[in-house]
Regions:
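Cofactor-binding loop segments of dinucleotide-utilizing enzymes, especially the Rossmann-like FAD-
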Residues: 18, 38, 121
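A local structural micro-motif
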Residues: 33-34, 200
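Anionic-ligand binding patches
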Residues: 2-3, 9-14, 49-200
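N-terminal beta1-alpha1 ligand-phosphate binding loop
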Residues: 2-30
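A short beta-strand-loop structural module common to alpha/beta enzyme folds
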Residues: 34-44
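Short loop/helix-cap segments at secondary-structure boundaries that form the rim of catalytic
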Residues: 24-28, 45, 67-68
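N-terminal short leaders/motifs
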Residues: 22, 28-33, 72, 78
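Short, glycine/serine-rich, charged loops/turns that create anion-binding
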Residues: 20, 40, 185
C-alpha cells in the first residue's frame, strides 16, 4: 500500500474509462479501483476552444454518474484531445485519416490536452493539463509502418507516445508525459489528496 492508498482506503474509487492506457496509469498510484464506463453523447459547443473542450467533456462524463454515485465513491473521468493549429484531432476514422493526421503533425509542434473530473459526494472538481509535443520530420514509410504495426485507431491524434512513434518520432516534449498517454498522474495525485484533506 502506498501513501495515497493509505489516505483513501475508506473510499470506493471508480475509473470511468474504457482506455487501457488510463487503467494502466492509474494502477501506478492506486491499486484498488473499479473500471466503469457508459456511452454518452460527446458533442460540445462549437464556441469552446482547445483546453475548454477537454475540460467540458471530462465534466460531462462525470455528470453522467451523478445520480448513481453514492457517498464516499470517487469517480474519475477524463478526456484527451490533440490540437494542431487550432484544429482538434480526434481518433482517426480509418487508416487514411490516421496517415493524414500524422503527416500534419510531422515536423511540427502540437498540444495534447487532458481534462479530468473528480466526482465525490455530489461535488465535481475539474482541471486540465497541457503538454506540447514536437515531432521529427516523418517519412511516408515511417508513418505507414506505424499504422500497419501498431494501434493508432483508438488514439487522439493517431499515435501513442508509449509506442514506436513515441520512441522514434518525438523530438521534444514540454509537460507531463503521462498526460499525453491520457491521464496526468502528477496533477491527479495532488487533486485527489486535496479532496481527501477536505473530507478529513
Amino acid at each position: 500500500m502506498n501513501l495515497l492508498e493509505e489516505k483513501i482506503k475508506s473510499i470506493d474509487i471508480k475509473l470511468a474509462s474504457k482506455s487501457p492506457r488510463r487503467h494502466q496509469l492509474l494502477r501506478n498510484i492506486i491499486k484498488d479501483f473499479e473500471i466503469v464506463s457508459k456511452e454518452i453523447d460527446e458533442s460540445y459547443p462549437k464556441s469552446l476552444k482547445d483546453s475548454e473542450i477537454a475540460l467540458f467533456l471530462a465534466a460531462l462524463k462525470a455528470k453522467s454518474y451523478k445520480e448513481e454515485a453514492k457517498e464516499n465513491q470517487l469517480y474519475i473521468t477524463a478526456d484527451t484531445i490533440v490540437v494542431y493549429k487550432q484544429k482538434v484531432l480526434g481518433k482517426p476514422k480509418n487508416e487514411k485519416d490516421a496517415f493524414n493526421m500524422l503527416q500534419e503533425l510531422s515536423g511540427n509542434t502540437h498540444t495534447v490536452y487532458t481534462g479530468v473530473s473528480l466526482l465525490f459526494n455530489e461535488e465535481i472538481n475539474s482541471f486540465v493539463d497541457a503538454t506540447e509535443v514536437t515531432f521529427y520530420d516523418l517519412s511516408k514509410d515511417e508513418i505507414k509502418f506505424y499504422i500497419d504495426h501498431y494501434k493508432p485507431m483508438d488514439k487522439a491524434g493517431s499515435y501513442g507516445i508509449q509506442e514506436w512513434m513515441g520512441y522514434v518520432g518525438v523530438k521534444k516534449m514540454e509537460g507531463d508525459f503521462f498526460n499525453v498517454m491520457g491521464l496526468p498522474l502528477h496533477r491527479l495525485y495532488r487533486e485527489i489528496e486535496k479532496i481527501i484533506s477536505k473530507k478529513n
